[in-house]
Curated annotation (Swiss-Prot):
It comes from Sinorhizobium medicae (strain WSM419). This is Apolipoprotein N-acyltransferase. It is found in: Cell inner membrane. Residues 243-493 form the CN hydrolase domain. One of its GO terms (cellular component) is plasma membrane. Its EC number is 2.3.1.269.
Amino acid sequence: MERLAGRIILLSGVSRAFVGFLAGLLAVLAQPPFGIFAAAFVSFPVLVWLIDGVAPDPSDGAFRRLRQPAAIGWSFGFGYFLGGLWWLGNALLVEADAFAWAIPLAVVGLPAVLGVFYALAVVIARCLWSDGWGRIAALALGFGIAEWLRGFVFTGFPWNAIGYAAMPMPLMMQSASVVNLSTINMLAVFVFAAPALIWTGKGARTGLAIAVALFTAHIAFGFYRLAQPAPPSAAPQMAVRVVQPVIDQAKKLDDRERASIFEDHLSLTAAPVQGGGKRPDIVVWPETSIPFILTDNPDALARIAEVLKDGQILVAGAVRAEDAGAGLPSRYYNSVYVIDDRGQIIGAADKVHLVPFGEYLPYEDLLTSWGLSSIAASMPGGFSAARMRPVLTLPGGRRLYPMICYEAIFADEVDANARLADVLLNVTNDAWFGDTPGPRQHFHQAQLRAVETGIPMIRAANTGISAVVDARGVLVLVLGYNYRGVLDTILPGKLPTLTDVPTRSRIFWLSMAILSIVASFSRFGFNIRKN
């Protein structure tokens, strides 16, 4: 292995970039649907050795010195995001005549842009690089900053954050009940990269001991938490039905199919409970499951009232229209409705974080001013964003915290209001992406929100994956991808919050400060030894 490390260190130019690309591609195997945890313990040591091989000319300026580490980081990131996001092209094949031209932008262009974040990570690390275990701290710091930025820069896209690779199953998710994802991102990189010290690093014992301690604590806390009794359901118990209709996206876009789609949802809602279980108190439909503007269709509300039993509540994804007034065109929102057994809409919540290029076109006015109005006109979407995400209170007092579609991937946006809720609600339509890794990755990220908040989650997805998840991230019931049917169960209870949002933020900044100090002292000492 030492010989292999030496060969990687000596690589340069295209060969170095290609190995970086392969290392990033390998790291994807640690994410769903593969969950091969060990892959990250190979890819990150390779990245360390590639950075070890950077030997800039002392006469070069600062910019030229950073080109090599930037190229390494970008190639690693490009491989990682290309391997993890290629399935986005499927969404553009649904209406291929209109959007096939954009497939290269989604499949290659987006990974190329996201690779810049990992280029920044490696540049930061290289600035604090040394020959000891401090360089592992520097790499963890760099990735911690990069992943934090990826969560909000240009509207944010923290999909497949490195930390998720360290949490492939509920046993390994429990640390998220104490620290936030940003902290886990940093510590995961430290642990993943630590094996590089075995063959190429001074002070290996210290670095490896810290990595082993972190990994052991991560696993031990998981065993401890899962060994505790499952949180009991709050009284009175609430029976939940989750509907997964499995409707092809092309069919959903066909206006002629609207009535049959609506009736399909109603038939699943009315299906008898298997095994003589309790009749559902709440029925949940996926995102945009109501295929028309509900407020313009009183007959549809009447049909819902016919199907719902006394006291039942329907929570359904729908497009909501709002009159803008003054002769302006209506505004449309991707929403969740709460509908009672009389067919009355008694609550609604609109999506706050819209999908760029899917639900709206970023910088549309700027593109139009540049003469690119044809591009703006060809893009899908046209939704407006809500300013806040309310907690929906149901009859009886139960409270839902709604997250529509990919809002569930933004861990930092699940605010203090979520702690007021009794259940997290995630409705989505992943039919756009087909039977690919995308829906599995999406589900895995949503599952973590239950662990972070200590609140159970109801997830309704058109084609899957639908589930009821308890407050520890354990699956109570699940319907896999493309399985049509319903889930009937009793809503699990909440768990006490171990740390609040401000405390987790402080832990993140403290961890970043510690890594900065370790890396800086290691670098400072390294420079003294060189001189």
